[in-house]
Regions:
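Feature captures outer-membrane beta-barrel proteins of Gram-negative bacteria and organelles
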Residues: 1, 7-11, 22-39, 45, ...
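Transmembrane beta-strand segments that form the barrel wall of outer-membrane beta-barrel proteins
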Residues: 7-15, 21, 33-35, 39-51, ...
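Outer-membrane beta-barrel translocator/channel fold
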Residues: 18, 22-24, 43-66, 79-80, ...
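Transmembrane beta-barrel outer-membrane domains
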Residues: 24-28, 38, 50-52, 220-222, ...
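Outer-membrane beta-barrel initiation region
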Residues: 68-69, 75-312, 376-381, 512
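A generic structural motif
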Residues: 71-77, 162-167, 263-267, 348-356, ...
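Extended amphipathic alpha-helical coiled-coil/heptad-repeat regions
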Residues: 282, 286, 318-328, 333-334, ...
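Intrinsic low-complexity, glycine/proline- and repeat-rich
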Residues: 471-512
Length: 512
């Protein structure tokens, strides 16, 4: 009709005999009509009438991952680099004067905080400055490192010739990024500034950096919290293909010292479209995941997780983690992880082991009810030891592979393979599959565990820098074979953003 309005008419010879007999709908007319109105390129409103027994209004939202709905990311402009005055001279031994170091920390801390960057430590000699920082804002670590380098270059005495930035993520120092100060002053405004700066930069392992003696005053303890809406979804149930729950979620994190993190999440369901009767699993395997619907339906505020974590560097190329508490919604216990990952390598090797017990449906205690096809029974206890040897590899063009071999929650042994494609704007799309020694028949419908993973950066959707990502795993069925512990912040995911392959992939944002 017009560029924005479209009228559609359809004649269907299908009498829908089986669907009508099953009571799904009444088929009163073979004619279907629809009127589309394109409000914006990404928003369409449709009014329709179909089968002679249904009318409705439909709103369709479309999006292209290449184009942010919030437009170009609106970043805070970085500070310009001020070249050192040739006549500026710092007294010999100035770095040994405690009051000067304290004054630098006092001056740098609030300015970095405006950029969403926390100053964790500052180590000084007359010619070298090493700043340990944690980036809480920028999706790209090179962008945060560039902001820190600019500020240090402007604030430090002229005798400092070398500046190093140690990016820390959740208590883990992954690398040391070292710049000649002359290069910072020379390449800021040149056409090839980013590539020239990368050529002048050295990236090394940060295990040898003396973090504790260089700790910034007031860096710890830290406390943060957030409160907001939360949506959870359960898909592909035959009785309710799209089950949604809208709730409120409170998350808190306390960091009493470097590497020590205490985190917790409390969720309250507000409204949902769950069916009145939950689906009772018919799995003949121990119900390590197939009873998840009873966890979703718990009344009252639910403590989803409450953990104490310690992350540390046991040596060069090595990273470690200990965790204890309610590790995830369905399991609590102890977990340990060790990762070997050279700073300039595309390959990493990790080992994780956990001793866990299944939690109660209400989130408190460790006595879930027995579930059979006949209904709920007496409380039971289930504990297990699970763990995996994991290999990671970063291919070119944003492809990342992960292979896990080990013992799963149902005490089955097997292997998982996952392949992800990561895009420059932060989107991640991938798929995984798991095969264990549980037979296809014993596994039940679906034969083996598989799914699609997606990760969407908040910065893409809101047009402002943010390190928060929205993650979802789409499984056709949630069964008990090949089930893994759902731990957050595994070491490889924390470390790799600060290593050479990922830094080089995002280095174009260094001067942003």
């Amino acid at each position: 009709m017009t560029d924005k309005v479209t009228l559609k008419a359809e004649y269907s010879s299908d009498a829908y005999t089986q669907e009508v007999a099953a009571g799904h709908f009444e088929h009163r007319s073979p004619f279907n009509l629809a009127l589309d109105y394109q409000i914006k390129p990404t928003i369409q409103l449709t009014a329709y009438a179909q089968h002679g027994d249904e009318i409705g209004i439909l709103a369709s939202l479309t999006s292209n991952p290449k184009h942010s709905p919030g437009g170009a990311t609106r970043d805070r402009a970085p500070m310009p680099v001020l070249p050192r005055a040739k006549a500026q001279v710092a007294p010999a031994g100035w770095s040994e004067i405690p009051s000067l170091r304290s004054a630098l920390i006092t001056a740098l801390t609030p300015v970095l905080r405006q950029d969403g960057i926390q100053l964790i430590g500052l180590s000084l000699t007359d010619t070298i400055a090493i700043a340990t920082v944690e980036n809480h804002r920028y999706q790209s670590q090179p962008q945060a490192i560039g902001h820190v380098a600019r500020l240090l270059s402007n604030a430090l005495p002229a005798s400092v010739d070398t500046i190093a930035v140690v990016p820390m993520v959740k208590g883990i120092a992954g690398s040391q990024v070292i710049f000649p100060r002359d290069a910072l002053e020379a390449h800021e405004a040149t056409a090839t500034g980013a590539s020239d700066m990368r050529a002048a930069t050295i990236v090394t392992d940060a295990a040898a950096v003396d973090h504790r003696s260089a700790a910034a005053e007031g860096a710890f303890p830290q406390f943060s919290w957030s409160f907001g809406p939360d949506v959870s979804a359960s898909l592909f149930d035959p009785d309710n293909p799209v089950a949604l729950s809208l709730g409120a979620k409170l998350t808190a994190e306390w960091v009493p010292a470097r590497g020590v993190y205490v985190t917790g999440t409390l969720r309250q369901n507000i409204v949902d479209n769950y069916t009145s009767t939950p689906r009772y699993s018919d799995s003949i395997i121990t119900h390590v995941r197939s009873d998840s619907t009873f966890y979703d339906r718990a009344d009252g505020p639910v403590l989803q997780d409450l953990t104490a974590n310690y992350r540390f560097r046991p040596g060069t190329n090595l990273y470690g983690r200990f965790s204890a508490g309610y590790l995830e919604r369905m399991y609590g216990g102890l977990s340990a992880e060790l990762l070997w990952k050279p700073v300039d390598s595309k390959f990493g090797l990790g080992f994780e082991v956990s001793a866990v017990r299944q939690r109660s449906f209400d989130g408190l205690g460790f006595a879930p009810l027995t579930v059979t096809t006949a209904g709920l029974g007496a409380p039971r206890s289930y504990d297990t030891i699970t763990g995996h040897l994991s290999g990671y590899y970063a291919f070119d063009d944003g492809l990342h592979a992960q292979v896990d071999v080990g013992r799963y929650l149902a005490k089955d042994w097997g292997m998982s393979v996952q392949l992800n494609r990561e895009f420059n704007n932060g989107w991640k799309v991938g798929a995984y599959a798991t095969l264990t020694d549980i037979s296809f028949d014993d596994f039940g419908e679906g034969s083996f565990d598989k799914g699609i993973v997606m990760e969407i950066p908040t910065s893409w959707s809101i047009g402002r820098p943010s390190r928060v990502n929205w993650s979802v795993v789409i499984r056709p069925l949630l069964r008990d074979g090949g089930a893994k512990l759902d731990l957050s912040d595994r070491l490889y995911d924390l470390v790799r953003d600060t290593h050479v392959p990922q830094l080089e992939a995002q280095w174009g944002r260094f001067w942003r």
